[in-house]
Amino acid sequence: MSEFRTPIKPKKLLDAGETITIPPSPFLNRLGYGTGVSVMQLVRSPRAGQIRSPWALKMLNKRVKPNRVYTDRLKVEAELLQRMSHPNIVGFRAFSKSKILYLGMEACDLSLGDMIERKIEDDCEPFSSKQILKVAIDIGKALDYLHTKMQILHGDMKSYNILVNGDFVICKLCDFGVTLPLDENGVFDKENAGQALYFGTEAWSAPEVIHGGTITNKTDIWPLGLTLWEMMALMPPHSRADDTLDESVTSVEDDSMEEDYFNEKYGTRPDVPANILPDLYSSALTLFYCCTETIPSARPSAQHLAEAAEHFMSILT
């Protein structure tokens, strides 16, 4: 699988947004984390009697050795968010390159990945068909904006990069640190990519990523399909729910077998769990199957996906 090398250098990035005072980490609520970064919630003090909404601050993780790759990713993401405006993409609030490098963003309630984890911990039922369709609608619209208006590939679609407000009132796409440029045909624009290559997360990666095929805008559609599957299966793609191996007695041979298992599964369509009844989830299953076609051209565009999901939603409501 291709590895991320050097992010595309931002054209120009200045400190933007209002100046804020960041309290020590113990006074910040951790919202999440990623490779080399932490996302914290900043509760802003009222100003002139007005209540101000909280922010999400993405900062370099202090426990990780300083790395220019992580710094450059954060700068690339800030520059990109400053240029984007879409209701289904997390909003830019501020960026600072002073003593503490941070990106201030609109705060949302939870990531979809966290919501899935909570359902697993509480032994809950899968998400409803309407909730799955809402994710397909909102994130389909966000990807359509990225692919057509901005001409970029998200590059790391997965449940943890989808933010949800309330009971699926609105879903927003986040984490734009490893985007790639697309040409007018929706194909990875290598000439304008510098040294950047597809990054992604293996479990969600499309077949063309795993097997070295052509990267296009349809490469974002596959992992979105797997995200819809996650909402039904309540587990990450290709994980082994029936794995009862005792970790205390694992061996080199066990590790090798585990690696072989995942190498065989990555880039394939996972089976639908037996408890997902076709009558209740027919529309969600239709979208899942369309998004996870092995041949990229057979997958819907982000626009067509959102339109199909809206049609199915109108039938359910």
Which residue ranges define each predicted feature?
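Conserved short submotifs of the Hanks-type protein kinase catalytic core
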Residues: 99-111
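Short beta-strand micro-motifs within the conserved protein kinase catalytic domain, predominantly
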Residues: 91-101
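Conserved catalytic-loop aspartate of Hanks-type protein kinases
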Residues: 220
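Activation segment signature within eukaryotic-like protein kinase domains
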Residues: 135-136
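Activation segment/activation loop of eukaryotic-type protein kinase catalytic domains
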Residues: 165-199
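Catalytic-loop of the protein kinase fold
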Residues: 147-165
